[in-house]
Amino acid sequence: MKPRGATELQMEMLEKHVSKELLDQVQICTSIPGKVPLDPNKLNILWQKNSWDQPNLQEFFNNKERHKEYDWYVFNSHWNYEKFRMIFDIPTERSLVIKNGIEYFPIRKIYKRGTPIKLIHHCTPWRGLNVLLRAMQEVENPNIILDVYSSCKVYGSEFSDNSEKDFEGLYEQAKKLPNVNYIGYKPHEYIKEMMPNYDMFVYPSIFEETSCASALEALASGVHVITNNFGALYETCAEWPVYINYSKNYEQMAKDTGAAIDVAASYLHEGFMQEHLEEQQKFYKRFYNWEKKGM
């Protein structure tokens, strides 16, 4: 199985929305300099989605002479661009931001009071699953159930074979919790189709995101989001979620997340919340849809 994470999905979208004739004029390398060879006959673009602190970026970006190798640097968020600008003094005159896109805007689920409240978490396990499972132990409302699709398989068979064992303990913990269903890996198309069946996406991140495809998928589906303000999440999610303040004290962050889930469950049926989610979906269709034409 080949990798099909956010980087691969965004490349698929780019190939869908940009003509082959135009794409043939550029050489795009995603995130890791040199992963795709430089082409002297094309514009060479580094499409940077990784965080500034990744070990495989340090040698290239700390050497300013090497910054000349690419004609353009494209970043997936203003947060990410600002980090590279500030830390590595990248060539700002050859940099720009193109945010990740989303193109699935299904009919939004309208929650009815008294029905089960379904939560989804479909991020890779090192990004905060440990905090979320601890948070679910704090949730008091018996009507709340969390489905966990967390897995390493999204990054391909080789990565999964080498890494999945490191998180077996978390998966086992998830299977034992009464208000959690551990489902594991499902293809992106499955997650996308199932998203409108959920009421909340919960993500207490401990991984500095440069953007967040999982959050975008939930927000664009009109799903209520509970997350924190770590990394670029506050840019991707704007003013739509309930934000828990990021803390290195994971126990406290888990308790705060659990409390936020219970509070959100108490107002999910209210008219103001349904209006909020409707406007949320419109926002992402307006600003993150790559089908938008030039103005």
In which residue ranges do the predicted regions lie?
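N-terminal pre-catalytic "stem/leader" segment of glycosyltransferase-like enzymes
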Residues: 1-38
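A charged, aromatic-enriched C-terminal amphipathic alpha-helix characteristic of glycosyltransferases
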Residues: 4-9, 248-252, 269-295
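Carbohydrate-associated surface elements
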Residues: 79, 101
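Conserved donor-binding/catalytic core segment of Leloir-type glycosyltransferases
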Residues: 112-128, 133-138, 146-147
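Nucleotide-activated donor-binding/catalytic signature segment of Leloir-type glycosyltransferases, i.e.
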Residues: 160-186
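Acidic donor-binding loop of glycosyltransferase active sites
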Residues: 196-210
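Short hydrophobic beta-strand element within catalytic cores of glycosyltransferases
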Residues: 224-227, 234
